Amino acid sequence: MLNKLKKAALVGSGLLVLAGCSSESADDASVNSEAVGAERLVVGLDDTFAPMGFRDENNEIVGFDVDLAKAVGERIGAEIDFQPIDWAMKETELDSGNIDMIWNGYAITPERAEKVLLSEPYIVDAQSIIVLKDSAIETKADLEGKLVSTQQSSSSVDKIMEDESGIFGKLGGDLVLYPSNNNAFSDLESGRVDAIVVGEVYGRYYMKQSGKDIYRVLEDNFGEDEMAVAFKKDNKELQERVDAALAEMKEDGTFDEIYDKWFYSE
């Protein structure tokens, strides 16, 4: 069964391929275009945001988005440099020309769409419900009377409390809140809670790193955010080249190879 992250990738791939077939600009944006030439493009990122972009034990910037950007760079004939930035100033850095792209788990919002030019969404981060594989919980409604854990002060808390199903008022107790999602996973594994709610991107990364095949992600969730690459409003040419490269990567399996390196799949 495809998880939501991969489903989003396949949907995005189809949209991009259709766009490439129907638009004259796609020819100009071909990832094999000789006109591209060698160039350097700067990606702005928060280098503490695992698994999208962060520093490893050797202080090297690594991550899912980092690997994607490098692969895209190879296809469009560009060297990709990664520049840590103040995340609160990311759009300012882009507008000033200090960076060419924001590529770091950048969620699409109406406000952001007014400020920047966005790529096609390439991944979805759901507020996922995660249980142990042998759990009887199959849907959001099954959380009634159950203990649920999540990270304190996270968007997950608000999503659970505001969910239109009203499940928050039917839980088997107060939300069990911890400083980090890692604590929530520990509670789930030990049986102290019945389910946890966490962003799917981080959740699947954690499960991949744990090496334990004991978890199950429900189809039901508490909402979804699409992620995209951001460009300056007037940089349509770069947007089209990146979109075309990502579409090719989804078609030829490169995207899945990078995905499977970083994320857990059932």
What are these regions (language model features)?
Residues 17-20:
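C-terminal motif of bacterial Sec signal peptides marking the signal peptidase cleavage site
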Residues 22-24:
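Bacterial signal peptide processing site
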Residues 28-105, 252:
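Extracytoplasmic small-molecule ligand-binding "clamshell" domains
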Residues 41-45, 141-157:
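Short loop->beta-strand "edge-of-pocket" segments that line small-molecule binding or catalytic clefts
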Residues 47, 124-131, 200, 204, ...:
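Periplasmic-binding protein-like
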Residues 69-77, 156-177, 207-212:
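Ligand-binding cleft/hinge of the Venus flytrap
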Residues 70, 79-142:
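Acidic, polar ligand-binding/catalytic clefts
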Residues 89, 106-114, 161-162, 187-190, ...:
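A ligand-binding cleft/hinge motif common to bilobed small-molecule-binding domains
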